[in-house]
Amino acid sequence: MSIRKRLTQEESRTAAVEAARALLIELGPQAVTLKAVASRIGRTHANLLHHFGSAAGLQKELARYLAVTICATIEAAVLASRAGQGTARDVVDLTFDAFDKEGGGALASWMLVNGNEDALDPIVEAIHDLVDDLGEFGSGANRQSTLALCLMAMGDALLGGPLTLSLELPRDSARDTAEAMLVAAALQSGLPVAG
């Protein structure tokens, strides 16, 4: 008979959120249930209820986790780009991948469809903090390009494949447009442009 290691509250929450992220990427947002996450980490449904209160609570925490980790990655790419060690395309690809491959777009749309709009607050706050941390909040051009980049990435994650196919455009068309937009915004703001 094996004895399970007792996890701290923070360790349990972290394990659950990481399992939820894996389920999101593998199977989509509908798979992120308390039962599925509990099964994946070897805990009980009641244990997860204790930590998150509901599936919506777990999804909100997952959204916060994704937003914080993704924004940290994007911030590093922006800073590298400004230092001449990265490109606008790096920022675009990370943002688009966050909404597509990392499941951010699917999770956001799933939460909206299910009436859980407040669960998107961590995403919106993390993006705002990212812009603020990068010292761009005072610049209207950069705020607008951040908004456009995020909306383009979200739209591409949800409809990009079928829409580019229908319009007979290359699959990366939205990414190309976003890159051109970021380069133009950087030039307008007097920021260095690499690549």
Question: Regions from the language model: what does each represent?
Answer:
Residues 117-128, 134-195:
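Hydrophobic/aromatic-rich alpha-helical bundle segments in the mid-to-C-terminal region
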Residues 89-137:
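Short secondary-structure transition hinges
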Residues 1-11, 194-195:
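N-terminal intrinsically disordered/low-complexity leader segments
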Residues 15, 19-57, 61:
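Helix-turn-helix
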Residues 55, 62, 66, 70, ...:
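Hydrophobic/aromatic residues within well-ordered alpha-helical segments
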Residues 15, 19-27, 72-80, 107, ...:
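Solvent-exposed, amphipathic alpha-helical segments
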